[in-house]
Amino acid sequence: MKTLAKVGVLVASMCLVLPAVLNAAEKKEPAGEKLFQQHCAACHPGGGNIIKPAMTLHKKDLDAHGVKTAKDIVGKMRNPGPGMTRFDAKTVSDKDAQEIAEYILKTFK
């Protein structure tokens, strides 16, 4: 009887722990990357720019245009120049815009 109880406890423990282990093992796409793919990648594949090739999302080009911080990138999203879609807060929330901006700065160096 004690062996059966131990097996029951072991099975119950595995049922509780296994889902957490499987979730941790799953590769999760960072929020910024997912949002970038959803809203930006069509015109900025790989950090490039299919409309204005000289205005990429790479650090040297961002710096050349006075875009140095995540706040600057969000500002460009909200009030872009000619040729870029405007992403207002109804289209991309402030939180999501910040995630995208941080992803850009981290990814396209």
Segments the model singles out, each with a brief description of its role:
Residues 1-28, 76, 103-109:
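Post-cleavage N-terminal segment of exported redox proteins
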Residues 15, 23, 64, 88-91:
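Short N-terminal micro-motifs specific to bacterial/archaeal maturation
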Residues 51-60, 75-109:
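Axial heme c-ligation environment in periplasmic c-type cytochrome domains
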